Amino acid sequence: MILRMLEEERGPQSTWAVGPLYRSRFPSTSLNRWMPQISNVISNDLTPTWEVTPSVSRQMSFSFIVRDNGSGFANGIGQTSTDLMDISVEDSDPFVILTPNTDVIWNVGSTEMISWDVGQTDNTTINCQTVNIKLSTDGGMTYPILLSSNTPNDGSEAIMIPNILTTSARVMVEAADTIETALDISCSSSANLILDDFRRL
């Protein structure tokens, strides 16, 4: 009993080959579920106490549950639906953005280079052949702006800075042709980017 209590307080470990690594969360209006939470991802913390990205090869099984509260049924009897998904995790080199990796100012209309370490994501097991490059203007919480679509997963891409001014931009590279984007293969820059108009500098 004492050992179990200590284990529960410690939380899951990235080296676990079996057992749960992520927790259930309350319903949300968001169409995306970040694992771990997006606030952890953008601070480069993929192993917070209760949601841990695995560092070893393993299988993970997920259950997505939708439940209504029965408001449209007699006596308030609700309905549920479940979708199951299994994911294979590869113990391989990380998929990470290399540049930008420091705070920098980019001018609207300029062409900038994004580079990333492909790791082993382009091998036959993971088979990520193309990526999307997206831009966040709110510090990495959302990535609504598509800078490049279905570009080869070759580690670099020149992108044009859109006509948007912000002091808290981030860049994300995500797989375009597999499920992977930290649980999906995705990586966001750790740098804080400032998008400015050179005419104002």
What residues fall within each predicted segment?
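Short, aromatic- and glycine-rich surface loops/edge beta-strands on solvent-exposed regions
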Residues: F62-V66, T167-D177
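Short amphipathic, basic-aromatic surface patches that mediate peripheral association
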Residues: D117-N123
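Short, solvent-exposed loop/linker segments at the N-terminal edge
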Residues: D103-S110
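A short beta-strand segment in extracellular, disulfide-stabilized domains
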Residues: T111-S115
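C-terminal edge beta-strand
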Residues: F73-D93, S186-A191
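Exoplasmic/lumenal beta-rich domain surfaces
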Residues: M1-S57, T125-A158
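Proline-enriched interdomain boundary motifs that mark the N-terminal boundary
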Residues: D93-P100, L195-R200
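Short, solvent-exposed loop/turn segments at the edges of extracellular beta-sandwich modules
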Residues: R67-G78, A176-E180
